[in-house]
């Protein structure tokens, strides 16, 4: 029973830490770029799109496909940065809590 009590306590601690991390992530803003910064995408820590900036030189009505690819590349850059930040914050907040092998946070 002592182990069950410890597990419940750890679960409560984990839940509180996750809530803290989620509120912090909402405040984080990450910029992803492509084409040497001519396409820029701003995401918050929750992965929500906040802003897209395009240099006029990448806007060619005759070649929309290139612009689409640049936007996707900038978004993926920002998304990767958000995920790296989340992993770093998760490691900080969850330090000391033992998780089963292969268990990934956030859930």
Swiss-Prot record:
Listed as disulfide-bonded, the cysteine pairs are: none
| UniProt-annotated location(s) | Cytoplasm, Nucleoid
Its primary localisation, in coarse terms, equals cytoplasm
Q: What HAMAP family would the database entry show?
A: DNA_YbaB_EbfC
Which GO cellular component terms are attached? bacterial nucleoid; cytosol
Under which name does UniProt file this protein?
Answer: Nucleoid-associated protein RC1_2305
What taxonomic classification does the UniProt entry list for its organism?
A: Bacteria, Pseudomonadati, Pseudomonadota, Alphaproteobacteria, Rhodospirillales
GO MF: DNA binding
Query: One Pfam family of this protein, by short name?
Result: YbaB_DNA_bd
Q: How does it assemble?
A: Homodimer.
């Amino acid at each position: 029973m002592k182990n069950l009590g410890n597990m419940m306590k750890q679960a409560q601690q984990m839940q509180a830490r996750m809530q803290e991390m989620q509120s912090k992530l909402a405040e984080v803003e990450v910029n992803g770029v492509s084409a040497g910064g001519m396409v820029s995408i701003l995401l918050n820590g929750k992965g929500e799109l906040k802003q897209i900036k395009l240099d006029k030189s990448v806007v060619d009505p005759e070649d929309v496909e290139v612009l689409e690819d640049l936007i996707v590349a900038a978004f993926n850059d920002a998304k990767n940065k958000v995920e790296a930040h989340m992993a770093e914050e998760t490691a900080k907040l969850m330090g000391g809590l033992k998780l089963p092998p292969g268990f990934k946070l956030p859930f």
